[in-house]
Amino acid sequence: KNTLLNIAKHWETGEKLPEEDYIKLCKNRTFNCGIATLRQLHFAITDLRLHSNKSEYKGKEADQIRREIAQNTTVIEPIDEDKFLCCFSHIFAGGYSAGYYSYKWAEVLSADAFSMFEEANLENTKNVKATGKRFKDTVLSLGGSLSPLEVFKLFRGREPKTDSLIKHLGLSLIHISEPTRLR
């Protein structure tokens, strides 16, 4: 926050960015993140189920499986003419077969790693430098010499958690017994 407020100035007058505009920018950053996250989860779950060997999916059409998933991952039910799978090339021709979830998982790891810097207090240069050194000595230095999970655990001191991503997206953990859908 302080960094942006110190450098953001009007190009003609030199007036600093007002606090209320900073708040608007922050709110805009997370606008529709819930819908975007549902969309990515829809893609990832569809990919995993279509590439699954589970018997519960045997004999079902791919589109039927996707529409069942849509019951919990979309706000608006897909129309009958929706042939989304015909153009979802990532999972059929793009090398992501059963791997589309890695997009969202990368966001989880990134947010969780960044939260360690936040926990060190971004305004505390000494703590941020120490955390940066730890990042350099683990994630950047070890690279592929260990499994990614082991490298992450060495940096973070624990397994990855989704809490930081949920927070950074401006979402909260709430329980809804039944999905709310627009039909």
Could you tell me what each predicted segment is?
Residues 174-180:
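Conserved small/polar residues in nucleotide/adenosyl-binding loops
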